[in-house]
Design a protein with these regions (language model features):
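Thiol-/selenol-based redox modules, centered on thioredoxin-like
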Residues: 228, 261-262, 319-404
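The canonical Cys-X-X-Cys-His
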Residues: 136, 140-150, 199, 214-218
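Axial heme c-ligation environment in periplasmic c-type cytochrome domains
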Residues: 160-163, 185-212
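Electrostatic cytochrome c docking/interface patches
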Residues: 116-139
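C-terminal capping alpha-helices of c-type cytochrome domains
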Residues: 78, 184, 203-226, 389-392
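Short active-site neighborhood of thiol/selenol oxidoreductases, capturing the structured segment around
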Residues: 254-288
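Gly/Gly-Pro-rich "capping" loops immediately C-terminal to redox-active cysteine motifs
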Residues: 137, 153-183
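Short, internal strand/loop/helix patches
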Residues: 195, 291-334
Length: 404
């Protein structure tokens, strides 16, 4: 996992959150006043620039300059209000406000601002659902794989014929861009510094739903390829939403458990014993046909992912072939972030099963070979140790430079 917030950068986290909230509020205000219209069904960002949160994230010095400058502007505004309300101290108030503006460490605008698109602040309507990921796979296979490759590494059969090799999707690239900007790159295409196209525009070929779906699939593809080649998920990945069917109850979206309950997905094909229920998390069976086993013994898990598409999506995220999926388990934390993967037939959960860790956030990424592949060395069992660590190290995902 390479896109979290460092524990010692709480102030930066707060600054980014405030800046994002301010931009969203400004966008909503402009839209409400009729100063900007819609683009692809959502309010369009009316300016060619936005605050470069991704730059501030990697340049704390620049972020401090901006923070002090914002503070100076706030102080100057307060001084102006005080001067208008208090005549006797008018001169002193004006002077203090002017001095604050003069002494402020104004950052270079070209560093603080970055190019924006009309869809920069768009939000995906898909909820990162299994159905959307499955749809996105079909779109990707038809329109994207020839250049980006089946595994997303940018080595498709047409890649060598392009003026520039496609970027790999099996890395933190998707985590550095807001979903709205990824959407714009797909519909409007991309150009190099020389103005020549480096990626065709698909705005006339794909509908909005297809574009959002292929973005969802690229996230799953990135996770699976990263897990297979590097032993980690390159960026934090949410547990995909899907319908959950439990015995005697109406289907519910998996998102209903987000924020309250951990989730364990276990792939079963009818040939292995069902996992035991565990009060520490919701155990959800993933089956090839989306139906629960005919016989569920007492104390065994019986809730099932009620869609056959979940099988292929889980295999993609786990980075294993669909035929090798039975017995694989995925763990998500209470906030819905996927954190660990258990291999079939594994006797105990191990430290290396944790594929999304806060320790990787500061760039101290461990390779799969460097991690010790032994059970977690704690007085408790390996699974309990992993759950405790997941709770102690929550994911604070920064996408497009802003906290999600």
């Amino acid at each position: 996992m390479g896109a979290s917030v460092w524990p010692d950068a709480v102030w930066l986290n707060n600054l980014l959150a405030v800046l994002q909230a301010a931009q969203l509020a400004l966008l909503r205000l402009c839209h409400a006043l009729g100063l900007t219209g819609d683009s692809h069904g959502q309010p369009a960002w009316p300016w060619a620039r936005r605050i470069a949160g991704e730059t501030l994230l990697i340049d704390p010095g620049l972020a401090r300059q901006l923070a002090w400058s914002i503070g100076a502007m706030a102080f100057a505004l307060l001084a102006l209000v005080l001067a208008l309300a208090w005549r006797r101290g008018q001169l002193a108030s004006f002077g203090a406000g002017a001095l604050a503006l003069i002494l402020a460490p104004w950052p270079t605008p070209g560093l603080v601002l970055s190019p924006a698109a009309p869809t920069s602040f768009h939000v995906s309507p898909t909820r990162f659902a299994v159905a959307s990921i499955a749809r996105g796979e079909r779109v990707y296979t038809q329109h994207c794989a020839a250049c980006h490759g089946d595994d997303g590494r940018g080595e498709g059969p047409l890649a060598a014929s392009l003026s520039r090799w496609p970027p790999t999707l099996a890395g933190p690239l998707l985590g550095r861009r807001a979903d709205g900007e990824l959407f714009w790159h797909v519909v409007a295409g991309m150009r190099g510094r020389d103005g020549q196209p480096t990626m065709p525009a698909f705005g006339t070929t794909l509908g909005d739903a297809d574009v959002w779906a292929v973005i969802d699939y690229m996230k799953a593809l990135s996770a699976g390829t990263g897990a297979r080649l590097q032993g980690t998920w390159p960026t934090p990945l949410a547990l995909p939403d899907l319908p959950v069917q439990c015995a005697g109850a109406a289907p519910r979206p998996l998102a209903d458990w987000r924020g309250t309950q951990r989730v364990r997905l276990v792939a079963v094909d009818g040939h292995a014993a069902l996992p035991m229920e565990d009060p520490r998390f919701l155990t959800l069976l993933v089956t090839p046909d989306g139906h629960a086993p005919a016989e569920v013994p007492q104390f065994r898990a019986g809730c099932v992912a009620a869609t056959p598409e979940a099988w292929a999506v889980m295999a993609r995220i786990a980075g294993v072939p669909a035929a090798a999926l039975p017995g694989t388990a995925l763990l998500s934390d209470r906030q819905g972030w996927l954190r660990a993967r258990g291999a079939p037939g594994q006797a105990a959960w191990r430290e290396s099963d944790l594929l999304c860790t806060a320790g990787q956030a500061g760039g101290q990424r461990q390779s799969a070979d460097a991690r010790i592949d032994t059970p977690v060395d704690t007085p408790v069992d390996g699974l309990t140790a992993l759950l405790l660590r997941m709770d102690a190290e929550p994911v604070r995902f920064v996408k497009g430079g802003f906290v999600h």
